[in-house]
Amino acid sequence: PIHSSAASDVYKRQVPTFMRLPNVTADHPRFGDVDIGLIGVPWDSGTTNRPGPRHGPRQVRDASTMIRAQHPVFGTRPFEIKNIADLGDVGPNPADIHDSMDRITDFYKTVMAAGIKPLTVGGDHLVSLPVLRAVAKQGPIGMVHFDSHTDLFDSYFNGTKYTHGTPFRRAVEENLLDPKRVVQIGIRGTQYDSEDVDFAMSVGIRIIRIEEFFKRDISDLMEEVREIIGDQETYVSYDIDFVDPTFAPGTGTPEVGGPNSFQALQVVRELKGLNIVGADMVEVSPPFDATGNTAFLGASIMFEMLCQMVNS
């Protein structure tokens, strides 16, 4: 492996990386040996409410130093199964959305060309679009999307097409996602109108609102998700505002009435068997995370995703 017990010593003092893993950049001689790369995208130019997700990767890195090497339920030891490394951050251009997206896509094209599966920490949810432009290189893929919002609006504020509320509308239009293999879970909160839901229905996206989420057994619900997604390539996108703000207050657009922190982990554990080619965890906003609980939950969700990806 490219690491040597880095993730087993929670008190090791070093430059912060995700889960104390080695930092392996694209010019590193062992870049091509990496199986799963953890990547930060410190960019929130798509934010329309409370800013701050650009600081998410650094805060989640710090929180992740207390993530240990073994899964508490499955016993999975991901760092012994695959070569996993922190690939560093993508350098965005905070003054130019399109240049930033191009930079992100180019970075991920390099990652994908090396055969590395990316696990991303944002950043706001617009981050997912340029990542998908690189990940869905062979054609449209499926997606499991945990969020309190659909992020399917056509535009915000006088026609702005690229915000954290529009990435998956663009992804469907650009043929990056197969809408009939997209499931959105946890949708709730007040709405401007029904445009996003109408679009979802018109293209075949399955929306599981929070009312249905709480009425059904999670294992049963996630079995339906696995049936919809099938065994083809899929992406997992996790907005931390999927979780109730009691447990995850540090986010830009919180919505009350959401899942608790255990349910936040449980839904990822139920992704077993999916062909996951990439994943992201976005919208952690440290300025609103006074206790650090949101960042630690985000780091824990990352570890759950990682355990699914090593067995994918």
Where are these regions (language model features)?
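Short, electropositive alpha-helical surface patch
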Residues: 94-104, 196-208, 289-311
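Gly/Ser/Thr-rich active-site loops/lids in small-molecule metabolic enzymes
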Residues: 145, 255-269
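Active-site rim beta-loop-alpha module in soluble metabolic enzymes
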Residues: 172-248
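N-terminal catalytic or cofactor-binding beta/alpha core of small enzyme domains
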Residues: 23-120, 125, 188
